[in-house]
Amino acid sequence: MSSEIKRVFVETVVCAGAPGKEARFMRMLESRQTYKRRQDGCLAAWTGSSIDGAGMVLVQSVFVDNKAWKRISDDVMKALDTKDGGLESVLAGPPLVGMFEIDLEKLRLPQ
């Protein structure tokens, strides 16, 4: 990891799969996170499921900067959305989405 990077952009999404489409929803989310992790400019990407059984999913990705986030997001749309139709058809409702700027040292990402 470059020592020049001081602050990173963390994309945070909270969402749920549509009833009967949860398994496909999770596969699609995981494929997108795997794709992001392979791209230069993405430092980490993961998903987490709620522990209360409510079906909520936390999706987070860490990018070196806003330009990397934009480029990788556009690449995901071109590479995956065109093949599988995108996440909209498997979402239970609108996701809660936020982008946060965080000091890299606070994340303690592996080198």
Task: Describe the function of each predicted region.
Residues 1-5, 111:
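Basic/polar N-terminal segments that are highly enriched at the extreme N-terminus
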Residues 4, 31-44, 62-99:
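An amphipathic, aromatic/His-enriched active-site/gating alpha helix that lines ligand/cofactor pockets
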Residues 8-16, 44-75:
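Short, well-ordered beta-strand segments in beta-rich or mixed alpha/beta enzyme
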Residues 14-27:
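Short, surface-exposed ligand-recognition loops at beta-strand->loop->(often short) alpha-helix junctions
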Residues 17-19, 65, 101-104:
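Non-catalytic surface loops within mature trypsin-like serine protease
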Residues 98-111:
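Acidic/histidine-enriched, glycine/proline-rich intrinsically disordered or flexible terminal extensions
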